[in-house]
């Protein structure tokens, strides 16, 4: 993903210092609102587009933040790296000697459908050769856009 979205200047990459489950989507909406200079409230349009990049598990903690993005017309693209589960949690299995994690798989979630229900546009990418064109469409959209990128499940 860094080949498609390089970090080239200060104030262009934000993250949290620890576990980020549930943090990313509302944080991206807040950053878009701040970068837009509160454009939806002032009526002044902004060309600064925010890109939120996070996993499908994290997205499920705070998906309703997309409604705020759509309602305020924020210039943003959400990229969900979709491996079908809470992969970050599965890394704890060896540390805590857990043989099987329960409730960490998220098969069949329709993130594009959820985004549309929240008032956003979206697309799903299932093959790497299609990523560049889909990302271009997402970045050129006049509305908040969710890009659901399927990747291989971990483990």
Language model: regions and residue ranges:
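Thiamine diphosphate
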Residues: 3-155
